[in-house]
Swiss-Prot record:
The record marks 106 as: Required for regioselectivity. It is an enzyme of class 2 (transferase). This is Reverse prenyltransferase criA. GO terms for biological process: alkaloid metabolic process. The keyword DNA-binding does not apply. It holds the Pfam family Trp_DMAT. The lineage of its organism: Eukaryota, Fungi, Dikarya, Ascomycota, Pezizomycotina. It catalyses: cyclo(L-tryptophyl-L-alanyl) + dimethylallyl diphosphate = preechinulin + diphosphate. Dimethylallyl diphosphate binds at residues 104, 193, 195, 262, 264, 347, 412, 416. It comes from Aspergillus cristatus. Its EC number is 2.5.1.-. Belongs to the tryptophan dimethylallyltransferase family. Pathway: Secondary metabolite biosynthesis; Alkaloid biosynthesis.
């Protein structure tokens, strides 16, 4: 594999994002401000990951036309659940053997009404974005599952009023979001993922999160044939008290019979023993050869990252006085049609850890896997993406490292990044 940091652009030429900044007439001041804060960085991710110049322009225009108008007022007034800093957008890179990194965008659409009396729980922006994406005519884009989970988890008018009487999102709950989107940028196409959070529905109705999710998944059995696999997961989650207000569901926005389901959640016990337990679903799938192989690599990555073990006091966001080391472990179980059991994925919190040391640990792990190109190029890639930051001093540019292992494709690692030019610390921090 050639260097994915090489570019077809001549040395010294202007980047596509710089050219678009010069020529695009932004319809609002908010959009212009969001572009200057997130657009050039997005452009550096595209270039750094090895996308050719034509594809860079394609995805930059998609960003300007579809994401930028849905970022809401600048600076952000709505604290999103999808990032440690509360920003409504996150970039990530996925790494696999013998391929260039794949860039993804995680995104919660916002509007000027988000969090106001007109739209206290941010429904308007999601509906507007779904309508916009339908007009773009993306390849294989389908909203069946989005509509299904929105119908099951969205708050009714009566539930909204009940939640407001409890104090709304200014009360005890830190979960503010109901839906979010993911965009995979591959092969000149945009693949869409949907996310739905059950926390607010739980607070408004008193129905346990696990029951909300289980009831919703059960309705999909005639088309997705995933109930047996889900039942293994649900049995473990119920007996280990694993469901909580942070649990949520994800799916591919394609035809329902071809989509995967992913169940997410968090746990404050950041210890290897808890990771091992959750990877094997409390021992339920520990004899599976793929699970064993993945667990061995997962333990090696854990040892390289040297994450402080202990019980995290996660209450949303991060605390400035402890370097941000309050983030929990995030887990994810993927359920495919006909699969005998869920496939685990873990997200290790590195928000608050030294970015240079984290990049070295990632590089060492790539070397252990025999991914020599990724190992050699990753530290340079991080500096290329954040040229104005001294990564030997920063601690919050890389937020999470996720790891999964599949029988046919092997290891699968992603890194999640801060997605704005503003530093994720100091007086301009999103509160």
């Amino acid at each position: 594999m050639t260097s994915y940091t090489e570019s077809s652009e001549e040395s010294g030429s202007r980047m596509p994002s710089e050219i678009l900044t010069s020529y695009y007439d932004y319809p609002t001041h908010d959009q212009e401000s969001w572009w200057r804060d997130t657009g050039p960085l997005f452009g550096r991710f595209l270039k750094g990951a090895g996308y050719d110049v034509h594809t860079q322009y394609q995805y930059l225009v998609f960003f300007i036309k579809n994401i930028l108008p849905s970022l809401g007022p600048y600076p952000a007034r709505w604290r999103s659940t999808i990032t440690p800093t509360g920003l409504p957008i996150e970039y990530s890179l996925n790494f696999q053997k013998n391929s260039r990194p794949l860039l993804r965008i995680g995104f919660e659409p916002l509007s000027r009404f988000s969090g106001t009396a007109q739209d206290p729980y941010n429904k308007i922006a999601t509906a507007d974005l779904l309508n916009q994406l339908a007009k773009v005519q993306l390849h294989d884009f389908d909203t069946q599952l989005f509509n299904h989970f929105m119908n099951d988890f969205d708050l009714s008018r009566a539930e909204t009023e009940a939640l407001q009487k409890q104090g709304g999102i200014n009360g005890k709950s830190t979960v503010r979001s109901q839906t979010a989107f993911g965009f995979d940028l591959k092969g000149g196409r945009v693949s869409v993922k949907g996310y739905a959070f059950a926390g607010l529905k739980n607070r408004a109705t008193g129905i346990p999160v696990g029951q909300l999710i289980s009831d919703s998944v059960r309705k999909l059995e005639p088309q997705m044939h995933c109930w047996d696999s889900f039942s293994i997961l649900n049995d473990y989650m119920e007996k280990s008290d694993g469901w909580n207000e942070y649990s949520f569901v994800s799916w591919d926005c394609v035809d329902i019979e071809r989509s995967r389901l992913k169940l997410y959640g968090v746990h404050n016990a950041v210890t290897w023993e808890k990771v091992k337990e959750m990877w094997t679903l409390g021992g339920r799938i520990e004899e599976d050869a793929t699970i064993k192989a993945g667990l061995e690599l997962l333990q090696h990555m854990w040892s390289l990252l040297r994450i402080d073990e202990g019980n995290r006091d996660y209450k949303g966001g991060f605390a400035a006085d402890n370097g941000g080391k309050t983030l929990p472990i995030i887990w994810n179980y993927e359920i495919n049609k006909g699969s005998p059991h869920p496939a685990p994925k873990f997200y290790f919190p590195v928000h608050g850890e030294n970015d240079l040391q984290v990049s070295k640990s990632i590089s060492e792990f790539f070397s252990h896997l025999g991914w020599d190109d990724h190992a050699r190029q990753y530290p340079h890639l991080l500096r290329q993406i954040y040229p104005n930051q001294n990564i030997s001093l920063t601690e919050r540019l890389q937020a999470w490292i996720s790891f999964a292992y599949h029988e046919h494709t092997g290891p699968y690692l992603s890194v999640y990044y801060y997605a704005a030019e503003r530093p994720p610390w100091g007086s301009d921090q999103v509160k």
